[in-house]
Structures are given as structure tokens and as C-alpha cells.
């Protein structure tokens, strides 16, 4: 009997709509983002998914997406676990910048490397930057040394994996059906881990907002199959839109 896991990237955020790097900045959803989250819930309901537990990050765009989706699923009562380890990749000094302007300044190739490569970090924020996570009380209990000032996808995976191993994998091993509402890069990190994707191939993996990605896993949590729910052509188009966000006009 397979275990079921759904990865759901948050719906469109206000900075997604403005094509800005977001990272750990706590930006809310647009109205379209709320609609995407609700539609995701309907797609999961049509699939007949009955979850036992849900996980999300400490950022409201993922939290609100989960709330909207669970409401549409009529599964609002589910236990929800939140962890900073599911936060988006920290984009360092790129956070808040327009992606097209950044591509025009640094070149599309460089921006694509920053956005989609596995082990290359963007420039870091300074320690005295007002947006440094150490100034945010939601991270007050954490050792300052673990708070990022920039991250590559590799760093993000290293951050996410302990939570997978300690919290999520044991639930799947207990035959629980699990929903994770998180972010483009924290989910890309999990996608890479689950599919044993190469460092090169992950460059071309783009996860669209608000479309549930259903994994079926074996009893050893190996991938049996995975697919986006709903129209596969719509998911492909949405993935291509994500890929094009860092291109200069």
C-alpha cells in the first residue's frame, strides 16, 4: 500500500505578482493567490484525498494557502505543524528586488544561476540589515548561527531535511496522508531529495503556485509516482511562467 504526500506551493503572493524576489520576507497572498489556494483544495477534494496531518512554514503566504485549501477540502480540523525549516530559500541581498531589473543589471544567465542552480548563493544581506531574521521574534528561540543571510538550494535542502526526517517521514511511515504547504524552493529541495534529481536537472525544475503535486511513496518512502492534480497542460504552462520570471524584457 502506497503512502500519499502532497506538496503545495503557496498561491500567488503580492511580490509574485510584482515579480520581486521574496525569500524570508513575510508577504501575503493576492486575491488570485487565495483563489489558487481554494482551487487547490477543490482539486484535492476531487481526488478524494483525506489528510491526517498538514505542515507549513512560518510565513503567512504558505499558512494562508493551507488555511484556504483545508477550508475547500472541508478538513479545517486537521492538526497543523509549522516550522521555520519549511520557509522559502533566503535570497540574501536579492530580497525585494525586481527580477527583470536584476536580470537587466546582472544578465539573465547570472540571475538564472542565482534562482535555479543547486549550490550557488546570491549575495548575502548585512548583519545590520533591518530584515535580518534575528530581528524577527518568530525566530527568537533559534540559535543565531542557524539563521541564514543567504542560501543556495543546497543550503535549503540541508535545512529542510532534518524536519523531513524527524517530523514528516515518521508520519508517512505510520501510513498517514500528509499535506505540505510551503514555497517554491523548499519544495524544490524536497522534490530533488525524493526523486534523487541530479544537481544539473534540478536547474530546470519549476514548481508553479497553487497546484497540488501528489506523490505516491512505497513503504520505504521511495517514489512510486508523482503528478500534478488537474489539467497537466495548465501545470506545464504555469511552470514555464515561473521559469521566465528572471528574464529581461
From Swiss-Prot:
Pfam family, one: His_Phos_1
Annotated residues for binding of substrate: 9-16, 22-23, 61, 88-91, 99, 115-116, 184-185
Record-level Gene Ontology MF annotations: phosphoglycerate mutase activity
Gene name linked to the record: gpmA
Key word Isomerase present: yes
Gene Ontology biological process: gluconeogenesis; glycolytic process
Protein task: Catalyzes the interconversion of 2-phosphoglycerate and 3-phosphoglycerate.
PANTHER family membership: PHOSPHOGLYCERATE MUTASE
CDD domains listed in its UniProt record: HP_PGM_like (cd07067)
Transmembrane regions: none
Catalytic activity: (2R)-2-phosphoglycerate = (2R)-3-phosphoglycerate
Subunit composition and interactions: Homodimer.
PROSITE patterns tied to this protein: PG_MUTASE
Protein name as annotated: 2,3-bisphosphoglycerate-dependent phosphoglycerate mutase
Family, similarity comment: Belongs to the phosphoglycerate mutase family. BPG-dependent PGAM subfamily.
Pathway: Carbohydrate degradation; glycolysis; pyruvate from D-glyceraldehyde 3-phosphate: step 3/5
Keyword Transmembrane helix: no
EC number assigned by the record: 5.4.2.11
Taxonomic classification: Bacteria, Pseudomonadati, Pseudomonadota, Gammaproteobacteria, Lysobacterales
Annotated InterPro entries: His_Pase_superF_clade-1, His_PPase_superfam, PG/BPGM_mutase_AS, Phosphogly_mut1
Keywords tagged on the record: Gluconeogenesis, Glycolysis, Isomerase
HAMAP family per record: PGAM_GpmA
Site annotation Transition state stabilizer: residues: 183
Active site: 10 (tele-phosphohistidine intermediate), 88 (proton donor/acceptor)
